[in-house]
Amino acid sequence: IFTTMPEETGIDIDLGIGAAPEGVLAAGALRCIGGQMQGRLILDTEEKRSRAAGMGVKAPNKTYDRTEMARGDVIVAATGVTDGALLKGVRFTKDVIETETVVYRSATGTVRRIQAEHREFAKFHLD
């Protein structure tokens, strides 16, 4: 996702592999902030080909762009679990659990950053 902000990162392009759900999430976030992405399915086993056919995939070798992978008004929210380039991980202090979240919306191009302090620990089931 950061590759769409080369002024901040110095990164112009990113290559990677992952499963389809991760690709859809990345495509959705990139749609929201003006980035580009292409992806294709790797159907290298009969099980994967059958599953794709059952899900309605008609062109198994097609290269999809970000608008084909994430259609409509897309909203993507991500909260850091461990520290990364985009988000800080969860922080535990004596009285507070701190989280950092980013929320993207394609219809408006809005990016919201939320830094939250959670004081009700019971909801996290940390026992």
Language-model segments: which ranges?
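An extended, acidic
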Residues: I1-R105, F121
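Non-transmembrane, aqueous-exposed alpha-helical and coiled segments at domain scale
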Residues: S106-T108, A116-H118
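Extracellular glycan-interaction surfaces
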Residues: R113
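Short, surface-exposed linear segments at secondary-structure transitions and domain or protein termini
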Residues: F121-D127
